[in-house]
Amino acid sequence: MKVFTTIPQHDLRLVPKAASAIEAAGYDGLMTMENAHEPFLPLAVAATATERIELITGIAIAFARSPMVVANAGWDLQAAAPGRVVIGLGSQIKAHNERRFSVPWSAPAPRLREYVLALRAIWDCWQGRGPLDFRGEHYRFTLMTPNFVPEPLSGPPPAVTIAAVGPAMLRVAGEVCDGVRLHPFCTRAYLDQVVQPQLAEGWRRGGRAREQFEISGGGFIATGADDAAVAKMVEWVRYRVAFYASTPAYWPVLACHGLEDLGARLNRMTKDGHWHRIADEISDDVVALFAAVGRHDQLEQTIAARFAGVSDAVFASVATAVPADLPPDLVQDLRRIPAAFTGFAR
């Protein structure tokens, strides 16, 4: 099993030291997120300070960027870090697209499917596999003169993964992507009852092999060196569970456990401005559904029980502002947990 963590994004001057330390600690990859900061710039800095570790956008907001822009960014990163770049894309929700990024909204699953196909068409052109002639419902790319073709890569373009929660997006991930980035708002039951069957249908449609498809995430991790540290992280997870449970897009996960009323109640509370009270609605039993909880000395067994057999990689940090601090020997213990993924198809 791979173990990923995050790097500070608020100050690019901190990235080289942080990235080097993460690599030295034995992590498999470092991720950036698109919250308060841009996700590609820190990876460019990290590429110059590391030799082995994967560089992952987890995730970049797709529809706010043309596929051509992402194709260029991914290509240049892969040139600096050959074979180490994974472009993770996500649709975000309607409100953020329309009101935060000022981009039009449409059904996200078919649009993101087309987006990934457009990315691959651009990269195929740059690899000399024919002229650029992509014509879809949302994107058209038909112009590429030699002046705009970047220098060849020494290997394949980046792997492409997408964030997915619902069945339609999970099927898209399985059909056209190299992997899926599961939301931490996820339970083992949802992994078994929804994620695996929908991905399998996508693999069938796309003719893809499970062992060449990476499943990342699928739950929170609340850990620390002692019980007090674990308890502090549990409270952080409790609020995050409440936050996501208040959003209708995530209610299919609640439905797996008959918790639809909880989602509706939390949604009303947020609309009424009661953000400071939402965590009170999340019981310890509900936290346990969404998180692997345990001290460092318990974590290998806890993560194996929660994720093994489905997830190929786990996210050890909870946010870019809180990088993981797992002991290096624990990172290696987690990496020994068996996983189905053997490598991206190239």
Describe the predicted segments one by one.
Residues M1-R346:
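Active-site-adjacent structural elements that line small-molecule/cofactor binding pockets in enzymes
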